[in-house]
Amino acid sequence: MGCDGGTIPKRHELVKGPKKVEKVDKDAELVAQWNYCTLSQEILRRPIVACELGRLYNKDAVIEFLLDKSSEKALGKAASHIKSIKNVTELRLSDNPAWEGDKGSTKGDKHDDLQRARFICPVVGLEMNGRHRFCYLRCCGCVFSERALKEIKAEVCHTCGAAFQEDDVIVLNGTKEDVAMLQTRMEERRLRAKLGKKTKKPKAAESVSKSDISEEAPGPSKMKAGKPEETSLDSREKKTSSAPRSAAAHGSSSGKAGKPVCGAPKRSIADSGESEAYKSLFTTHSSAKRSKEESAHWVTHTSYCF
């Protein structure tokens, strides 16, 4: 029954029960949230950005995540809600003057104070180490403690003076309830942005169609300054001159000689009041008529034979 040496095993040593849930050290969890990038798990270094859920990232890690097209990208669930660089905001952090960094523990003879933070609240002076709630503004990226926003109520930023609304305040590394609330606000914000884009497209199309119609529509005719009698006479002369031209053009296009206008009277140069010198240019003049003796030989071809 016993083992060597006379020992008897007990029940709790032989029967395996349920494993105890391992408790995470709160200090280690806070250090991981406030000092390391959520995506790459590297130490936070400027420029530092935050998403709409209040998580901290290195900006270069976010850019690499967006540029990565491989299948391993699906593993980054912590940044699955980041679709573009516009979904993150670069933070304006205030340095802690008491922060020594790695200089104090280079020899290993000093204690590392995990409660000492790199950044502080510029209004109250609280250290951003996770013991106090901090938030940032989406409009400008300035970071404050929640106590500062509650004690000094204002509608403008305490640092840069930019106006903000309650929807622009996002809690950094909040609780599960805070993350759920920020998730709903993010979805509503993106839905409003999509609806705004859809309403802008038909408005732009309507403006383009109206401009085309205004260009094609004839404008009001403007009368030139002058006497009404002169304008009416000019219009009549233009109409009469355009009529024979159109008739001639129609005849030439059809290939047949255009017929003279029936209304146009025939006139003779002999009956006109022109000078004798002008009339002598034509063959119908008396000086152009010759007798048979003066006429040329029948072989000679001249216009006078006809």
UniProtKB/Swiss-Prot annotation:
Gene Ontology annotations for the cellular component aspect, listed alphabetically: nucleus; replication fork
GO terms (BP aspect): cellular response to hydroxyurea; mitotic DNA replication termination; regulation of DNA stability
Keyword Isomerase set for record: no
The keyword Repeat belongs to this UniProt entry's keyword annotation: no
Post-translational modification comment from the UniProt entry: Undergoes proteasomal degradation, via DDI1 and DDI2. Removal from stalled replisomes and degradation are required for genome stability.
Basic and acidic residues composition bias: residue spans: 226-240
UniProt-recorded Gene Ontology molecular function terms: DNA binding
Compositionally biased intervals (Low complexity): 241-258
Chain positions covered by the region annotation Disordered: 192-306
Principal location class: nucleus
Compartments (UniProt record): Chromosome
Coiled coil (UniProt feature): none
Key words, A-Z: Chromosome, Phosphoprotein
Compositional bias ranges of the Basic residues kind: 192-202
SUBUNIT field: Interacts with DDI2; probably also interacts with DDI1.
Protein family membership: Belongs to the rtf2 family.
Stated name of the protein: Replication termination factor 2
Lineage: Eukaryota, Metazoa, Chordata, Craniata, Vertebrata
